[in-house]
């Protein structure tokens, strides 16, 4: 395996993080709907596995259904990561899943100002503290691999290298580190087209929000500090509306 091939695979995985979580939600029109509570409920449900009464009401689901949606989301995350790989072991799938759980549950965010735009939409400011996830994860593995003789390199499968990198990511979560300067991301909560009393957050807004919640340039092999802008070209899965 060439190190550049490993970099390309990891970069592809990194860019897929922004489209992993799909949120199902609906709301009630009028004074009963709180866009800030709705936004926090969605994030808590799919990142923290925490389900408030308000979220269950807005998503029109039971707690068991919400828990299943969380588990299904993690399964989808793993499938997205391995979609172009053959014969991925159960052990690596489990490590990927554990990695997602650790990253998501340690994301830090607060709901700030909520503005009623008087056109049926709401602007919600989310203050995020970027989680340092990928620092010193791929570099050490690359250096170690490059230091091996060609004969020894042949003994390393791509999966084994992936396992080493994921282990580094999970180890990073043992000592949490966040950027000192918080980032404010304003998203729009809007009615779902042709769905009365249902609301959703635009997929591009989710993409910007997730990009602000964690680093990425280090893991992709880019030493710059422009990771907040590095996801502009990624695509996010549109969150479906609930029935």
Give the positions of each predicted feature.
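Positively charged n-region of N-terminal signal peptides that target proteins for export
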Residues: 2-10, 14
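Mature, Sec-exported extracytoplasmic domains of Gram-positive
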Residues: 29-243
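C-terminal motif of bacterial Sec signal peptides marking the signal peptidase cleavage site
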Residues: 22-25
